[in-house]
């Protein structure tokens, strides 16, 4: 397949104009405009671990690798091409994700729109019109809402911060630094009485990337008050009968790391001190995605070991911090959803920090925050993991992840390790309501974990229950060699 003429001028090339040119060129199968104004386009996005991957499925990623000067002709590395492409796509301000259908079996792809004010290949810079259909109305269970005090009067929020410039080289350099190979007054309340959404609604693609809603919304007024933080949790709320304050679930307690796991965060040779914040040598790359009732409203990749999620940038509680700002809910179509979301955002604040091989969270304000790993929300009663105010809590341990990833590679573990964390603001997770029904949901994905998980999949590991999968990984996959070598030295 012919490549674009601009490939080769890597030093002067910018990703945004290059991608627009590629979409218009018609050279890449599945990469095309899908609206007459040429503001919305689709990108083929088949997972590298699928058996039916062909060269045409990765052609656009390979083309950018060549254009950006990252292509090595003697080694075909589709996963690396795709990672480079994804990092470039996220770091530019020119595009926004409309639909993620990468999990679709027949035609995996993603749909992007050219951001307002950015000219397309025809020079038009008008806004994207009609790309997103109106969102379904609010599904709200008043028992789920959790505030310590009555929210104050709402004010309009501030636009979210711009995406940060992230490059794969940062990940590569940190991995090399660790001697790890990169190769290898209560308002009137309402509750919905119609059909509940499916548990996996967030994963089901709709025509506009939003949640499929019921045909008819039936609302009824509720007499019971909003659940406050100083009230006991009854059977109708988030806890058990007669329960008081929500304890952190003991099921989710992280065991103490073994000496071999500790070694994952130490260089075999003396190394300079870790960067500020002491993240244990791990790259501080964290994908943060914000959803308002199942609809993605913001996404950012934070390259700092510390950040604060907040709504008001001038809030003294978050002064002089790296901010990830919640978008204003003013554009939400449902007035009840808009009001409740605004009330929660006014009293929401959370600090995240990667330190000593862990991801730590501290609630800063009145809005309660519950957290869970994605697999804990797939069936049964989810854990009642509550972040207490001004108390630092470990919500993810990278050492546990590395141990589980090794076991997954060696077929000692059927399921892949879980590295996706969900945070729910003002509502607790429930087995009867999907997470997509929550007013404010935040998804966290550490890039370190995603990168190494993809490396294992490239080596042949699969989360399918295959039973007798033979895993043959390259000798250069030093993450696990490091563990095994340490075991040999200490036995």
Curated annotation (Swiss-Prot):
GO biological process: defense response to virus; immune system process; positive regulation of DNA-templated transcription; positive regulation of type I interferon production; regulation of transcription by RNA polymerase II; toll-like receptor signaling pathway; TRIF-dependent toll-like receptor signaling pathway
The entry's DNA-binding region: 12-116
Keywords: Activator, Antiviral defense, Cytoplasm, DNA-binding, Nucleus, Transcription, Transcription regulation
One of the Pfam families matching this protein, by short name: IRF-3
SUPFAM superfamilies: SMAD/FHA domain, Winged helix' DNA-binding domain
One CC-aspect GO term: cytoplasm
GO molecular function: DNA-binding transcription factor activity, RNA polymerase II-specific; RNA polymerase II cis-regulatory region sequence-specific DNA binding
Induction (free text): Up-regulated by poly I:C.
Keyword field contains Hydrolase: no
Keyword Ribonucleoprotein on entry: no
Tissue-specificity statement: Widely expressed with higher expression in lung, spleen and intestine.
Subcellular location per the Swiss-Prot or TrEMBL entry: Cytoplasm; Nucleus
Family under the similarity heading: Belongs to the IRF family.
Task performed by this protein: Key transcriptional regulator of type I interferon (IFN)-dependent immune responses which plays a critical role in the innate immune response against DNA and RNA viruses. Regulates the transcription of type I IFN genes (IFN-alpha and IFN-beta) and IFN-stimulated genes (ISG) by binding to an interferon-stimulated response element (ISRE) in their promoters. May activate transcription by complex formation with other transcriptional factors, possibly members of the STAT family. Binds specifically to the IFN-stimulated response element (ISRE) but not to the IRF-1 binding site PRD-I.
Protein name listed in UniProt: Interferon regulatory factor 3
Origin species: Gallus gallus
Name of the encoding gene: IRF3
